[in-house]
Amino acid sequence: MSIHPVVLVGGGPGAWDLITVRGMRALQEAEVIVADHLGPTAQLDKLCDVDAKELIDVSKIPYRAQVAQERINEILIEHAQAGRRVVRLKGGDPYVFGRGFEELTALTAAGLPVEVIPGVTSAVAVPALAGTPVTHRGVVHAFTVVSGHLPPGHPKSLVDWAALAQSGATLSVIMGVKNAAAIAAALIDASLSPPHPRTHHSRRLPRWRASIPVRVG
């Protein structure tokens, strides 16, 4: 029995046609697709013959349905060890807050080969499609991607908001809608001088509804 690499595919920022060509080919070759709502699953039929695949839903809906990461790892291992061609379809890029490295670690510990196909992260794609560059010559020469799922001051947060406020870089905050007010306050408290331009993109593509230019302060 042949063992095939488990392929971790970055599905891009939401729209089905923003996945990479290599990612699409991996889906077409797969026998099993392990996907959650963060990838382009709603229009998966535009990328491959869904009826010819086993599609396993491992929902990751914030504050609602969740499949534990440990169980996702087990599913990937079980099907790969059975000799099936397995794709793990993820949103954005597998390694940008996608827990892709956790899956790679579990798979390699089980003695299984892994291939990673990068994806376009929403941290750059969504601002770009809304007309907001994350860098601009003579204005900003750096950008930082930050998780906002924990508020500033949370004991488990690893983000130094004070340092970011002083960095001069564009901040692209992912999963930050719930804590947007607290994040803005923390940046101001750390001397990010208001008014400071900020654009709020409330959803990933194609489901985001509006881009709202606002100011911190």
Regions found by a protein language model. Give the residues of each.
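A generic local secondary-structure boundary/capping motif
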Residues: R22-M24, I77, G131-T135, V159-A163, ...
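Short, charged, surface-exposed secondary-structure boundary motifs
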Residues: D45, R64-E70, A125-P127, V146, ...
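Class I S-adenosyl-L-methionine
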Residues: M1-W16, V21-V120
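A contiguous loop/helix-start segment that scaffolds small-molecule binding in enzyme catalytic cores
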Residues: I3-L8, A82-V86, V140-A142, S147-G217
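Class I SAM-dependent methyltransferase SAM-binding "motif I" and its flanking Rossmann-like core
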Residues: H4, G91-S167, V216
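Short hydrophobic/aromatic-enriched beta-strand-loop microsegments
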Residues: A52-S59, P113-E115, V134-T144, S191-H201
